[in-house]
Amino acid sequence: PRQWLFSTNHKDIGTLYFIFGAWAGMVGTSLSILIRAELGHPGALIGDDQIYNVIVTAHAFIMIFFMVMPIMIGGFGNWLVPLMLGAPDMAFPRMNNMSFWLLPPALSLLLVSSMVENGAGTGWTVYPPLSAGIAHGGASVDLAIFSLHLAGISSILGAVNFITTVINMRSTGISLDRMPLFVWSVVITALLLLLSLPVLAGAITMLLTDRNLNTSFFDPAGGGDPILYQHLFWFFGHPEVYILILPGFGMISHIISQESGKKETFGSLGMIYAMLAIGLLGFIVWAHHMFTVGMDVDTRAYFTSATMIIAVPTGIKIFSWLATLHGTQLSYSPAILWALGFVFLFTVGGLTGVVLANSSVDIILHDTYYVVAHFHYVLSMGAVFAIMAGFIHWYPLFTGLTLNNKWLKSQFITMFIGVNLTFFPQHFLGLAGMPRRYSDYPDAYTTWNIVSTIGSTISLLGILFFFFIIWESLVSQRQVIYPIQLNSSIEWYQNTPPAEHSYSELPLLTN
């Protein structure tokens, strides 16, 4: 108990993040099953659109702030960054502990916000005037805002910690251009967090004072403008989606490189520049979420072009992964299956993103299920596939145990079918004009919604199967004697699992 509560050890804190993320992931998945159950058939199942939108909002917040970010940045980041840098721990170990312990209260506040009054049925964007005092009276939205504040503080502290660690604690010989790609992905992610989260904090604080202290930042009656909120929110919100995927890029680079039996990823310097370019461009495209609010045609033209340019560094990454795989004799291990699934399905999600980047097309597709399909392809089949690949790949290092490979392959096939069956039909629904954030729909949309709901049930079985596989591994205790991998990066030189204090003597990278 004391060891976990007051931990200053990056491995223990990383493990806490994994457990927290897995728990939040189960809550978020349960909410998504409620959504698909409601939409599995025309007519009402759970209730009215308010409760439906409370579920949708909580699903988004939990999956983003309490599942993907804690697992990718808190779990994999904490575990792997010090090991890959040859550093004994993070730069600020106690702040690291605080970053974690801010999250359970944040999640609690979010869950409480759903339980008081009518809940926050605003969508994760929390746009006023729907989120303002009149349309959403009561404490729900205020509690959700405080939840976001805590999660944001946690992420900012974590970001400062990672940036400082990478600048100051690289081992001798690990220059920036020789630093592993996963470490690069985490430090770029940290920079994005550091620059974008304060803007979100400002926006939701202004919303808080509009609701409670009679200001009118977003109220036209007092000279405010609700569009200002949208600009502030999306200036955070767009970098945020790259924050969610960049650590995944880093993990996929390591996994593909290692499973290909190559010594390094193809074009690793180009991969670094591509991630930097994605991070920079991510800050200057935010208004592509706002093509329907009545911006000037020249503004729309700029945001269309800038958004499409992001496809270039992303394409560099995709083709470099393919080049890394080129000419290899692949053994289809579970980790490489997830990585290959990532590359393929992330590309599909990226292509629908390029479609939506066209402002004139987006005016038709905005707020339809086409957008839902797009971002779930890059999240549910990008971020989640990367998490699955990374977890399976580094599980023997983290625990010193092995998973059942045959079951993992079956589980991959189950999940692959499930997520595609869930989200591919949503492209058709969107093109046919089915709008987002409604609990009911005209009969014409029934067929594809039934298919989608069946897919979500298959995905749920896949998730449960995965938890069973982990349980089986933990109770069977099949110890790893030595890693079967070539040491493609230095974390594999550790024991399995690593000693509590690794690198008590610092390593040296020679030429």
UniProtKB/Swiss-Prot annotation:
A biological-process GO annotation: mitochondrial electron transport, cytochrome c to oxygen
Localization annotation: Mitochondrion inner membrane
Cofactor mode of binding and number, as noted: Binds 2 heme A groups non-covalently per subunit.
Chain residues that bind Ca(2+): E38, G43
Gene Ontology, cellular component aspect: mitochondrial inner membrane; respiratory chain complex IV
InterPro entries the record matches: Cyt_c_oxase-like_su1_dom, Cyt_c_oxase-like_su1_sf, Cyt_C_Oxase_1, Cyt_c_Oxase_su1_BS, Cyt_c_oxase_su1_dom
Pathway membership, UniProt: Energy metabolism; oxidative phosphorylation
Coiled-coil residue windows: none
Entry binding sites for O2: Y242
Residues involved in Cu cation binding: H238, H288, H289
Binding site for Mg(2+): H366, D367
Gene Ontology molecular function, alphabetical: cytochrome-c oxidase activity; heme binding; metal ion binding
Reactions catalysed, as given in the entry: 4 Fe(II)-[cytochrome c] + O2 + 8 H(+)(in) = 4 Fe(III)-[cytochrome c] + 2 H2O + 4 H(+)(out)
Cofactor or coenzyme needed: heme; Cu cation
Membrane topology value: Multi-pass membrane protein
Record-listed cross-link 1'-histidyl-3'-tyrosine (His-Tyr), residues: H238-Y242
PROSITE patterns recorded: COX1 (PS50855), COX1_CUB (PS00077)
UniProt: heme a3 binding residues: H374
Cell wall biogenesis/degradation recorded as keyword: no
Keyword match Methyltransferase: no
Oligomer status and interactors: Component of the cytochrome c oxidase (complex IV, CIV), a multisubunit enzyme composed of a catalytic core of 3 subunits and several supernumerary subunits. The complex exists as a monomer or a dimer and forms supercomplexes (SCs) in the inner mitochondrial membrane with ubiquinol-cytochrome c oxidoreductase (cytochrome b-c1 complex, complex III, CIII).
Role description: Component of the cytochrome c oxidase, the last enzyme in the mitochondrial electron transport chain which drives oxidative phosphorylation. The respiratory chain contains 3 multisubunit complexes succinate dehydrogenase (complex II, CII), ubiquinol-cytochrome c oxidoreductase (cytochrome b-c1 complex, complex III, CIII) and cytochrome c oxidase (complex IV, CIV), that cooperate to transfer electrons derived from NADH and succinate to molecular oxygen, creating an electrochemical gradient over the inner membrane that drives transmembrane transport and the ATP synthase.
Membership in a protein family: Belongs to the heme-copper respiratory oxidase family.
Entry protein name: Cytochrome c oxidase subunit 1
Species per Swiss-Prot/TrEMBL record: Drosophila sechellia (Fruit fly)
